[in-house]
Amino acid sequence: MSGEDVRIDNMDLAILIKKELERKGIRKNGINGILGFQISKNEELEQIKDLNIINTNIGEIDELEKLPNLRNLKISSVNMRTMLKGEIMTPDDRYNYESKLSGIKDFSVIERLGKLEILQIDNEKNLKRIDTENLKNLVSLKLRDNPNLKEVRGLDFNEELSELDLEHNRGRWFEIK
């Protein structure tokens, strides 16, 4: 499997991966129209250790599993409280705000990213629960300003965890298991 190309169907994720590869100075194959983004697995995808999905409408994240060495994942949507302090929102402002929401509905793929060391998720209205049991290498977990987060599971299994920040999660009932 070392020389095989891996197809990333989520174009927004493909663009983020492309930017990360460019930042690292790694040559990439490019975007092939609407068919997806072809990347050599060993030479490129395996080199991505950090990924920031910040103020970017990405939708699905199930293809994060195609990044086998991902160590640091940050996901954050724009925070409405800090975007416009006391100003009236115009239609342009609303469009700008909505384009900065991640659009992620299902975060369960994160539970299968076993090499993660740092996980940060901020301002995600669709994050309701997360299970970190399989994230054995997790050192830092920051879950902040997620209004519907109600449950964090598996912390007992995160023996390397040295930083935990569960600030401003406004779920009515919040349970740590």
Feature locations, PLM:
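Small side chains
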Residues: A14, G114, D131-T132, G154, ...
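Short amphipathic alpha-helical segments
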Residues: L64-E65, G86, T132, G154-D156
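Leucine-rich solenoid repeat scaffolds
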Residues: P147-K177
